[in-house]
């Protein structure tokens, strides 16, 4: 299996499984074959299956949080929406929750309120919270270091004010993968 191979290749047992952008789950062939199943139910079933594999191999999984928010909001994240408590209660405690946000970083009242709201919503989970910001290199031929520093300042300071000190930075190779990371 994939997990067995990963464990043979790497010493770490902390793996970011991502599982983000899964807001259309259950709407493809599964819908045609088995009928409609609520996304929250499919997600809970999937996390249970993956969790058993993680336990088998001693893996501490990290998953993206947008999949909990997207079914209940018009976008990835919102300044008003909430994840239903019954969804939160079905997230196994072994999972670390990664709140990723590369865009919401304006130092306006609206952005600050949205970021604060999202942190408060993440704290409703009974899981460790991590934050993932972005080093902007995916939007053209040159990295946007100035914006990366600007957004990192906003996100890091916001996380620390809310007691979140497990912070990571991502770079992506899409939409301008020609750009250097530096």
PLM segments and residue spans:
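Substrate-binding groove of N-acetylhexosamine-processing glycoside hydrolases
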Residues: 1-8, 12-15, 21, 32-182
């Amino acid at each position: 299996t994939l997990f067995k191979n990963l464990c043979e290749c790497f010493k770490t047992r902390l793996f970011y499984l991502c599982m983000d952008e899964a807001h259309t789950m259950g709407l493809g062939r599964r819908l045609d074959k088995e009928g409609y199943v609520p996304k929250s139910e499919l997600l809970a079933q999937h996390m249970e299956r993956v969790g058993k594999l993680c336990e088998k191999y001693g893996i501490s999984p990290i998953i993206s949080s947008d999949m909990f928010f997207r079914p209940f909001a018009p976008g990835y994240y919102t300044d008003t929406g909430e994840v239903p408590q019954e969804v939160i209660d079905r997230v196994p405690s072994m999972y670390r929750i990664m709140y990723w946000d590369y865009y919401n970083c304006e130092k306006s009242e609206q952005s600050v309120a949205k970021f604060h709201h999202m942190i408060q919503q993440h704290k409703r989970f009974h899981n460790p919270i991590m934050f993932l910001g972005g080093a902007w290199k995916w939007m053209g031929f040159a990295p946007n270091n100035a914006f990366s520093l600007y957004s990192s300042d906003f996100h890091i300071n916001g996380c620390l004010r809310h007691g979140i000190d497990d912070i990571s930075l991502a770079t992506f190779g899409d939409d301008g993968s020609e750009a250097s990371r530096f």
